């Protein structure tokens, strides 16, 4: 993983190009991320930044974390995340510095990770896209039942990982190779092409893309 930012998903809109084409974008607000710790090869075996995002009352921070924030001379945050760094990335930055949206540029491709919307307990039709059974012709009880979930005496059990009913959503999801359409430094906004995981107001983590798009190869 390379350097990234923690932001808040605001919602979706669209923008128009000079030729009149409509591009759907997700608006992400990135409050400046405060560096709380710089990890180095000499002390930790790898290079990384630990950053804090948002604000939290000092009364709601436990003593170990309060000491950690105090050592870096930064305000306590809602979230604390770590980003691995390459050998040449941000070599001059130090604890207490702020990372803003200007570390990204328009046209850059990024990966975005967020917590998907929780949809509660769902059956196999909604959860795993199973087909329904017959609506008529003698079927009166099992229209949306999954059917057989195992075999006979051999192996005599249900395989681990079998697709069944259960919790849907509320898991972390990463979308890759999303293009940054616009960087608004004044308002701390990123406009990223397409949809991003999570509900409006949810936390998202934006990092440089780990893959190259076909047109970039």
Swiss-Prot record:
Residue numbers of N5-methylglutamine PTMs: 153
GO BP terms, alphabetized: translation
Pfam families reported for this sequence: Ribosomal_L3
Claim: Hydrolase is one of the keywords in the record: no
Source taxon at top rank: Bacteria
Keyword line: Methylation, Ribonucleoprotein, Ribosomal protein, RNA-binding, rRNA-binding
Listed GO CC annotations: cytosolic large ribosomal subunit
Region Disordered, annotated ranges: 134-154
Signal peptide interval: none
Post-translational modification: Methylated by PrmB.
GO molecular function terms noted in the UniProt entry: rRNA binding; structural constituent of ribosome
InterPro entries, A to Z: Ribosomal_uL3 (IPR000597), Ribosomal_uL3_bac/org-type (IPR019927), Transl_B-barrel_sf (IPR009000)
Record field: transmembrane: none
Protein purpose: One of the primary rRNA binding proteins, it binds directly near the 3'-end of the 23S rRNA, where it nucleates assembly of the 50S subunit.
Stated family: Belongs to the universal ribosomal protein uL3 family.
UniProt xrefs under PANTHER family: 50S RIBOSOMAL PROTEIN L3 (PTHR11229), LARGE RIBOSOMAL SUBUNIT PROTEIN UL3C (PTHR11229:SF16)
Assembly notes: Part of the 50S ribosomal subunit. Forms a cluster with proteins L14 and L19.
Protein name according to UniProt: Large ribosomal subunit protein uL3
Source organism: Coxiella burnetii (strain Dugway 5J108-111)
Gene name linked to the record: rplC
């Amino acid at each position: 993983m390379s350097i990234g930012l923690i932001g808040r998903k605001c919602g979706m809109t669209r923008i128009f190009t000079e030729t009149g084409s409509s591009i759907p974008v997700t608006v992400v607000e990135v409050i400046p991320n405060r560096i709380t710790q710089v990890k180095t090869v000499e002390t930790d075996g790898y290079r990384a930044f630990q950053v804090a995002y948002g604000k939290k009352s000092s009364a709601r921070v436990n003593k170990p974390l309060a000491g950690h924030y105090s050592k870096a001379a930064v305000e306590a945050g809602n979230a604390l995340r770590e980003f691995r760094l390459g050998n040449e990335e941000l070599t001059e930055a130090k604890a207490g510095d702020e990372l803003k949206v200007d570390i990204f540029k328009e046209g850059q491709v990024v990966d975005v990770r967020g917590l998907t919307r929780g949809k509660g307990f769902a059956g196999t039709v909604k959860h795993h896209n199973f087909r329904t059974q017959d609506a008529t012709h003698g079927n009166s009880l099992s229209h949306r039942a999954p059917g057989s979930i195992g075999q006979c005496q051999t192996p005599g059990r249900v395989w681990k990982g079998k697709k069944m009913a259960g919790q849907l959503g509320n898991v972390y999801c990463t979308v890759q190779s999303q293009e940054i359409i616009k960087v608004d430094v004044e308002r701390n906004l990123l406009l990223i092409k397409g949809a991003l995981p999570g509900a409006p107001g949810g936390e998202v983590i934006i990092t440089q893309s780990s893959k190259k798009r076909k047109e970039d190869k």
